[in-house]
UniProtKB/Swiss-Prot annotation:
Subcellular location: Cytoplasm; Nucleus
SUPFAM superfamilies: ITPase-like
Protein name from the UniProt record: Inosine triphosphate pyrophosphatase
Residues binding Mg(2+): 41
Keywords: Cytoplasm, Hydrolase, Magnesium, Manganese, Metal-binding, Nucleotide metabolism, Nucleotide-binding, Nucleus
């Protein structure tokens, strides 16, 4: 679809692998190139973080790019830890995330992924959000990718993200849902260009 690869700004090898896999599937594969750019990260919602990061990355790289921010919101805690999940996980681990909900019957949570796309320097990033509902469970499966071992999506047939084969996870994940919207947008833009 694209004449040159789309730049994904991340230093996270697991995210890069998933994004490449998801965007290369289907009838209009999108080739991804990685750039790890050290950018300051503001505190805010996933939308605010992704948009700011994308704007800065496009300026630094001088080209079109995508950035991502994720969140895990516990419904009993009114959406916390949300975009700060990375810090909660680093400080508390999987067991600590479960302990946060020990006093609540409601263990439901939403996994949220927000991608921002910028056509290049000086353009306002466009936001694509994906959301997958599920619940927080004691860790199951390999604990190698963030909080995957404690998140059991409703559509996961009783498996955590970590227990799922990647091809199954990548059909229902929050990341897949956001990237599917991004793919549709990029295809529509490519069609406009061809018809001009």
């Amino acid at each position: 679809m694209a004449s040159k690869p789309l730049v994904f700004v991340t230093g996270n090898a697991n995210k890069l692998k998933e994004v490449k896999y998801i965007l290369f599937q289907g009838g209009n594969p999108i080739e991804i190139e990685n750039q790890a750019v050290d950018l300051p990260e503001i505190q805010g919602t996933t939308t605010e973080v992704a948009r700011d990061k994308c704007r800065r990355a496009a300026e630094a790289l001088g080209t079109a790019c995508i950035t991502e921010d994720t969140a895990l919101g516990f419904n009993a805690l009114k959406g916390l830890p949300g975009p700060y999940i990375k810090y909660f996980l680093e400080a508390l681990g999987h067991e600590g995330l479960n302990k946060m909900l020990a006093g609540f019957e409601d263990k439901t949570a939403d996994a949220i992924c927000t991608f921002a796309y910028s056509a290049g320097p000086g353009t306002e990033p466009i936001i694509f959000e994906g959301r997958t509902p599920g619940k927080i469970v004691p860790a199951r499966g390999p604990g190698i990718f963030g909080w995957d071992a404690v998140f059991e999506p409703i559509e996961g047939n009783g498996l955590t993200y970590a227990e799922m084969p990647p091809e199954e996870k990548n059909k229902i994940s929050h990341r897949y849902r956001a990237l599917d919207k991004l793919r549709d947008f990029l295809q529509a833009e490519a069609n406009k260009s061809q018809n001009s």
